[in-house]
A protein has these predicted regions:
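Hydrophobic core
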Residues: 11, 15-19
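Sec-dependent signal peptide cleavage junction
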Residues: 19-29
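Surface-exposed binding/hinge segments that line
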Residues: 86, 94, 129-170, 184, ...
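Bilobed "Venus flytrap"/periplasmic-binding protein-like clamshell domains
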Residues: 178-203
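Bacterial N-terminal signal peptides that target proteins for export
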Residues: 1-8
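N-terminal lobe/hinge region of extracytoplasmic solute-binding protein
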Residues: 35-88, 180
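Aromatic- and charge-enriched surface segment that lines or borders ligand/interaction sites
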Residues: 83-125
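Short, well-ordered beta-strand elements
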Residues: 29-40, 92-95, 114-117, 144-146, ...
Length: 203
């Protein structure tokens, strides 16, 4: 009787292991396939366009986009695409970008590109526009100067929000919400509520 119980338990365990879903590595392709329950239209992550609702979370999560600043593991603000910032006065912020940052298509991520990205953000994302209260942005080489309509002591924190992923707006946004960013991956295909394909950023 004891042997039969042991055999039944072993069979049940084997079936459980067999049914467990695990990440798969496709043979000879170096392809990692995994599921994500948050990347869907219901969660307002229909694509990876950071200017679209909360899709900035997907843009940053999958390594396509990067923000000017980010939070460290200890929740401290640290540079990312940007190198440093200066709070010139209560309405003026000067941000210096890191040298040599490029988008995945090879375009330089300079002050003008960042200006375009932020202007597109506040034009298309109501939440970002309300948070940032940007009045004007000026670009000069590798720096941008932001003027706000009211004092914004937390401006750098807001620029660290995933909606602040810097994208190449000159390259445009595809109909299915694919953008060009500065991250380690490039999106090649996206179908909302189904899949997102990524390849290594060669730039």
């Amino acid at each position: 009787m004891r042997a039969k119980k042991f055999l039944a338990m072993a069979i049940a365990l084997g079936m459980t292991v067999g049914l467990t879903s695990v990440p798969t590595l496709a043979a000879d392709k170096k392809t990692f396939v995994f599921g994500d329950t948050t990347f869907n239209a219901e969660n307002e992550e229909a694509d990876i366009n950071p200017q679209n609702t909360y899709a900035g979370w997907a843009c940053i999560r999958y390594g396509v986009g990067e923000t000017l600043f980010r939070y460290s593991d200890t929740m401290e603000i640290e540079p990312w695409v940007a190198k440093e910032y200066e709070n010139v006065d209560e309405l003026t912020w000067k941000i210096t970008l890191n040298d040599g940052v490029v988008f995945s298509n090879g375009r330089a991520c300079d002050g003008e590109a960042v200006k375009e990205s932020l202007e597109g953000l506040i034009a298309n994302n109501e939440r970002a526009a309300g948070d940032l209260c940007i009045d004007s942005i000026e670009a000069d080489g590798n720096t941008i100067t932001i003027k706000t309509t009211e004092p914004k002591p937390a401006l750098i924190n807001y620029l660290s929000d995933p909606y602040g992923c810097i994208i190449d707006t000159e390259a445009g946004i595809t109909d299915n919400g694919i953008v060009i960013g500065t991250g380690p991956y490039v999106a090649t295909d996206l179908v909302t509520d189904d899949h997102l394909n990524l390849v290594k950023n060669e730039n």
